[in-house]
């Protein structure tokens, strides 16, 4: 990727790239250990917080909200908000990994659209390397999920497990933050888009998050359901939305 002209700018500052690679390796190792030995949920959560902090520490942070240019307010708040979002998305994706092909299919669709738009956005606005970084991550996810999905389709011959689902969630969160958290709404004005056109311009960027709305809702309901019953929030059950839809036929 470093030899492709469009992606060369990403490697000009190796810090974020190395942090993402290191975080990916760590979360895969923890996921594999969990798949083998069923680690306590506190260990998994600690690992998720650690990898999220590593990525945020190297500058991939939510600095502003794209609509209206609202800034987060302080470096500490930006750091903590980034960690929260990454951990939230990782667990939301992990929680929907209950049916053959579900995570790989959702990721393939959302990141396919995300890749096209982030690439076009990078070309039109001449942005910083964070736009190109988002495109690179989306391209990696599209390729990985497209290659994995045929083997994970019902009846699956390969399973993603916690190692795969947490990795997909991590990369999806980082790619989304790299664009939406670093974007300058003024750049759209420079290319002729007025304020009334900002929302349509950002809709494709928000598509991956829109697709994750259902997993996030399922994650929230699952945590509330399990905690209220005095169980670990990571205890498996068959009350997820996709299980209920499957039972309904």
Segments from the language model and where they lie:
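Hydrophobic, membrane-embedded alpha-helices of multi-pass small-molecule transporters
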Residues: 76-99, 140
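Glycine-rich, flexible loop/turn motifs
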Residues: 32, 61-68, 98, 154-156, ...
């Amino acid at each position: 990727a470093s030899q492709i002209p469009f992606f060369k700018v990403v490697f000009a500052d190796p810090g974020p790239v190395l942090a993402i690679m290191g975080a990916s390796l760590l979360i895969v190792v923890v996921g594999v250990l969990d798949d083998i030995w069923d680690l306590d949920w506190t260990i998994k959560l600690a690992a998720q917080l650690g990898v999220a902090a590593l990525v945020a520490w190297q500058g991939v942070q939510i600095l502003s909200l794209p609509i209206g240019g609202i800034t987060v307010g302080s470096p500490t708040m930006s750091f903590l908000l980034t960690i929260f979002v990454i951990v939230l998305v990782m667990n939301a994706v992990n929680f929907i990994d209950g049916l053959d092909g579900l995570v790989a299919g959702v990721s393939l669709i959302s990141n396919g659209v995300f890749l096209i738009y982030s690439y076009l956005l990078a070309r039109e606005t001449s942005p910083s390397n964070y736009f190109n970084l988002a495109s690179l991550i989306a391209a990696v996810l599209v390729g990985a999920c497209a290659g994995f999905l045929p083997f994970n389709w019902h009846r699956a011959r390969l399973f993603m497990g916690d190692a795969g689902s947490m990795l997909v969630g991590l990369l999806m969160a980082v790619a989304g933050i790299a664009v939406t958290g670093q974007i300058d709404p003024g750049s759209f004005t420079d290319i002729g888009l007025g304020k009334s056109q900002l929302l349509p311009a950002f809709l494709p960027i928000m598509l991956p998050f829109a697709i994750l709305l259902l997993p996030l809702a399922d994650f929230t309901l699952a945590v509330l359901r399990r905690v209220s019953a005095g169980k670990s929030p990571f205890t498996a059950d068959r009350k997820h939305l996709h299980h209920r839809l499957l039972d309904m036929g």
